[in-house]
Amino acid sequence: MIYAAFRSIGAYIPPKIMSNADFEKIIDTSDEWITKRTGIKERRIANEGEASSDLGARAGELAIERAAISKEEIDLVICATVTPDFLCMPSTACLIAAKLGLSNVMAFDVSAACTGFVYALNVAKAFIESGMKKNVLIVGAEKYSAILDYTDRTTCFLFGDGAGAAIISATNDKSESIIDINCSSDGNYEDLIKTPGGGSKNPCSQEVLENKMACIKMKGNETFKLAVKTLTSDVKTMLEKHNLTNEDINHFIPHQANYRIIKAVGEALDLSDEKTVVTVDKYGNTSAASIPMAMNYAFEQGKIKAGDTILFDAFGGGLTWGSALFKFAPIKR
């Protein structure tokens, strides 16, 4: 029997910091208001000319290095993003593969907004367990600064740029494998989080540009309530399915959208603050990159170790949501 194992984690954090004080200069807001509402203190911004593939390639490079495998051993690249380098083609995954020097490798994108990394992990798991692939590089990469309206005080301060990546590999040892992944969606809530212009429904036009329809729009209050309810239910279902309790989880890594959401879900699940990884204060909401960036942060802080049981939980536009339960299983060399 072939299983999928989570072998390594890596991230790229752009060096440029945009603080709440910077937003005080461009919109009617304050550091106190942003911090109280979201828990965000600062976020990272990619350099001009940098694209999601540049961020993703840097994160991927680190993940490959930590997995202690050669680039030639990678046979699939999946990139989760909603800020691709190009609107239609080529895929960001293809560009990441090229920048990593990978040739003749299968590569494609996954679009599931903030749940994208969990979706990509699920696809990687399926490819490996089917025997079709042995080593998969999954990347969550976002340059949200490219799709923000910096006059919109309801959204512009929420998001940041960055990338995270992981190597998922085949193993015969069930004890070190990915235990389970759940991915769901409900398109009836499409209006809660969306970029209304630029696609085939509302193609690029003078109207789209003038009304900034190619920028992200979000109904914050409705999204908040639904996120807390959905994330809590999803985790409870996952734990009950495997006869686990919160005591069996070493690290809870939720999507980093808003500290109040993270806190509310943690309290509903009775998960201690010590087990919950929080980076939203440092990076803001980096969508598909937020979970791997948060895991990488905890790993570099020495908190995540081989054999730890980790639980991902994410919620995003679509709507999409999902959870993943797995053992962290770096290759022993």
Swiss-Prot record:
Record-linked NCBIfam families: fabH, PRK09352.1
Protein name (Swiss-Prot/TrEMBL): Beta-ketoacyl-[acyl-carrier-protein] synthase III
E.C. designation(s): 2.3.1.180
Pathway: Lipid metabolism; fatty acid biosynthesis
InterPro entries according to UniProt: ACP_syn_III_C, ACP_syn_III_N, FabH, Thiolase-like
Subunit structure: Homodimer.
Record-linked HAMAP family: FabH
Similarity annotation: Belongs to the thiolase-like superfamily. FabH family.
Lineage: Bacteria, Pseudomonadati, Campylobacterota, Epsilonproteobacteria, Campylobacterales
Reactions that this protein is recorded to catalyse: malonyl-[ACP] + acetyl-CoA + H(+) = 3-oxobutanoyl-[ACP] + CO2 + CoA
